[in-house]
Amino acid sequence: MMLQSIFLEPLFWGSILIISIQNLAHMTLEEIYFQEAVCVVIMLVIDIPTGALADIIGRKKMLVIGHVIGFTNFLFFAFMSEPWHTWVANILWSIGGAFRSGADKALIQESCIGLDKDKHYYRKYAGKASGLRFLMFGLCAPVASYLAEYNLRFPLLLSIPFLVIPLVTAFMLTEPPRDGVRELSVKDHLFQMKDGIIDTCKDKRILWIMLYLCVISASSKIWFFAYNPYFEHVGLPIRYFGWIFLVLNVIAWLSSQYGSKIEHKLGDKVTVHILIPLIGIPIIL
């Protein structure tokens, strides 16, 4: 699972993502934002039944399907030349992401339970995996920006072989036994989803948590999608994009390494409040 977490996203694309879509697919920034908003909604809708679907067909099969779809979506990005290519790619990204989210975290948590590990072990594992992914992104970013000076498509093509790694490892996973868990029919799962949605709508705390996550996610997306145009606006040559991305990802890597310890000391409530200015201030600046 660690390899899947590290190589989940294209390694050589992050530092030139927006500029490559603008130039290769001939899209404006406004069109990219609109497309992203539509696809996030699609992902949220599809994400609702994926947990139940993972219970029915199995976590491993869900992960395999998600990674196959994810690999296919990036092929559309790698060879994009028109806006509709990115529409297909992003819709596939939404579907693949929903399938993976319905299985990967549950599979890790069930494995932790099987190994008699507590919730802090899961947080530490998740932080370490995220940190290594940030570090890999950072180390690959300068290479990507230098290649992009010659051809914007080169970094995308270079990312393809690494996306095979999570796909192959998904086939090699062993799903832990779910002892004591009663198997439910499709009808039972549908009733559970209906009851879950009703209970969620009635619980103000859950609604506030969902709103908080939406705001944090949207703010992060805005920042991530705005840095390429900002670099261009201030006249920064593309070959330096990757070096700035390297610094940012090293900071993210260090934060992930010690994130679980900081969260454990500060507590969930304080950590949640600290995240708001940490994400909001950079956007304002």
Spans of features found by a protein language model:
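Cytoplasmic helix-loop-helix junction between adjacent transmembrane helices
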Residues: 91-134
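Cytoplasmic membrane-interface "Motif A"-like loop-to-helix N-cap segments
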Residues: 56-67, 264-277
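Juxtamembrane intracellular "pre-TM" segments in multi-pass secondary transporters
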Residues: 175-211
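Helix-loop junctions on the cytosolic side of multi-pass membrane transporters
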Residues: 152, 157-185
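C-terminal ends and interior cores of transmembrane alpha-helices
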Residues: 68-82, 277-285
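Transmembrane alpha-helix termini and helix-breaking/packing motifs in multi-pass membrane transporters
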Residues: 20-24, 134-159, 229-236, 260-265
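Helix-loop boundary and gating motifs at the non-cytosolic
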Residues: 1-45, 203-246
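Helix-to-loop junctions at the C-terminal end of transmembrane segments
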Residues: 45-58, 148, 254-268
